Amino acid sequence: MYCPFCRNPDSRVVDSRMADDGSSIRRRRQCPECGRRFTTVETTSLSVIKRSGVGEPFSRIKVISGVRKACQGRPVTEDDLAMLAQEVEENIRSSGAAEIDAHEVGLAILGPLRKLDEVAYLRFASVYQAFESLEDFESAISLLRHEAEAAKAGAKKATGSEKSQL
């Protein structure tokens, strides 16, 4: 690592810490030549392979801009979108892959978006999964309803078992 002050090609690591919720490492370094200290932040690279075969770095900003249109007119804040993008990136990085298809990024967006706002999820899924008919929308909506009912039934069972234990 070159010193940014004197361009000496050597430096010593003084301190290392996790940063950005564990997705990067912050290192405090000292130059043995000039004695000045500087900070570096190291992250693993994550490339998205587009349909054309061209790779580009993963971007939370692109995730947010892709989802923002689906969230227009919905009670979704910029903070919500930032948290969604962070969750998507964490899910992708947890797979351990250095490269991921753009299609997989879209799939990784669907889950967190569904938890955030079901209408925005339907809007995004209709474009991403290329809904072609009303039946496509109806099947997606019925799946959402079925899962919501199953979640309610599970919650009722859990509260019922808690009451019986009292």
From Swiss-Prot:
Keyword Isomerase tagged: no
Positions of unnamed zinc fingers: 3-34
Cofactor: record remark: Binds 1 zinc ion.
UniProt entry keywords in alphabetical sequence: ATP-binding, DNA-binding, Metal-binding, Nucleotide-binding, Repressor, Transcription, Transcription regulation, Zinc, Zinc-finger
GO annotation terms (biological process): negative regulation of DNA-templated transcription
PROSITE patterns: ATP_CONE
Stated role: Negatively regulates transcription of bacterial ribonucleotide reductase nrd genes and operons by binding to NrdR-boxes.
Protein name: Transcriptional repressor NrdR
Species of the source: Paenarthrobacter aurescens (strain TC1)
Chain's gene name: nrdR
